[in-house]
A protein has these predicted regions:
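Small-residue helix-packing motif on alpha-helices
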Residues: 35, 191-198, 220, 231
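NAD(P)-dependent Rossmann-like dehydrogenase/reductase catalytic/cofactor-binding core
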Residues: 2-5, 200-270
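NAD(P)+-binding Rossmann beta1-loop-alpha1 motif at the extreme N-terminus of oxidoreductases
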Residues: 1-52, 61, 123, 186-188
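A short glycine-threonine-serine/GTX helix/turn-capping micro-motif
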Residues: 161-172, 221
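Rossmann-like NAD(P)(H) cofactor-binding subdomain of soluble oxidoreductases
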Residues: 18-23, 42-128
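Short conserved AdoMet
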Residues: 30-31, 83, 105, 146
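Internal alpha-helical scaffold of NAD(P)-dependent oxidoreductase catalytic cores
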Residues: 99-109, 125-162, 173-212, 258
């Protein structure tokens, strides 16, 4: 089934992640004629009508695509326009569904999403949570997010936060790993540009291999590592007690902890 925006659909704000989603929808051939981007700057969004003030009609679909810190500034003008026929979709990190419900009490449904940057290439992961309906009842949202890649429908907001740390923030962590791999190659004598290209293609190729073969990452590591070979020696460093796993555990813990702090800050403003 082709994803279709309920009409009229508003995208309030269009930051980096919201812009990536628009790029992915357009790349996937989704009809954007029902969508209006509303942003104070009036900065155009390619392929989508962009205005600076809210239209007169009540929206059927609203997606919040600005920074969480601007929520209360936006609510004053937007909340009176969100009615019983409006599905409100939020990508605001750390702002709980209950906080959104308090600010938009008339909304038909409140849906939280956590997309990641590869949605722009229709290769994303989008976590979805709502207490106001299941996947069938919120099929418009499900189809729109599925058109950008993989979706993960969450049973709790805690699960949404964990997937956000693994997938949304995880893009930055994978990119930082690739950067570190390139720097290590450069330190061993590779030219800077060459090291970067090799590291990037290694990440791309590993993902493509996993997708094509259905192999788990652990299986790929075992395939590459010959007994007593060079790869095995390197993996021994990564697998040490103070190696990669505990480092990533601390990394995700820090991200999730910050998400909880943001949620507490938003709740304190309720």
């Amino acid at each position: 089934m082709t994803a279709v925006f309920p009409a009229p659909a508003w995208l309030v704000g269009c930051g980096n992640m919201a812009g990536a989603m628009v790029e992915g929808w357009r790349a996937g051939g989704i009809d954007m004629s029902a969508v209006t981007v509303i942003r104070p700057s009036g900065k155009p969004v390619e392929g989508v009508r962009t205005i600076t003030t809210y239209p007169d009609e009540k929206p059927a679909f609203v997606m919040l695509g600005f920074k969480p810190q601007k929520l209360d500034e936006v609510v004053a003008g937007l909340a009176p326009l969100v009615g019983a026929g409006t599905t409100l979709v939020s990508m605001l990190a750390g702002v709980a569904a209950a906080s959104l419900r308090g600010r938009f009490p008339e909304a038909k449904a409140i849906v939280r999403i956590m997309p990641n940057l590869p949605v722009a290439q229709v290769q994303g992961v989008t976590a979805i949570y709502s207490a106001d309906g299941n996947q069938d009842e919120l099929h418009d949202v499900r189809q729109l997010m599925a058109s950008l890649g993989m979706i993960a429908w969450c049973e709790t907001e805690e699960e949404l936060g964990v997937i956000g740390a693994v997938a949304a923030a995880g893009v930055a962590y994978v990119a930082r790993f690739g950067e570190a791999l390139a720097r290590s190659g450069e330190a061993l004598g590779l030219r800077s540009v060459q090291a970067q290209m090799v590291a990037e293609q290694t990440l791309i190729g590993t993902g493509a291999f996993a997708a094509a073969t259905g192999s788990h990452m652990a299986d790929i590591a075992r395939q590459v590592a010959s007994p007593k070979g060079t790869t095995e020696q390197g993996l021994a460093v990564l697998d040490a007690a103070d190696g990669l796993q505990p480092l990533l555990d601390r990394t995700l813990d820090a991200a999730i902890r910050r998400g909880k702090e943001l949620a507490a800050e938003a709740a304190a403003r309720d």
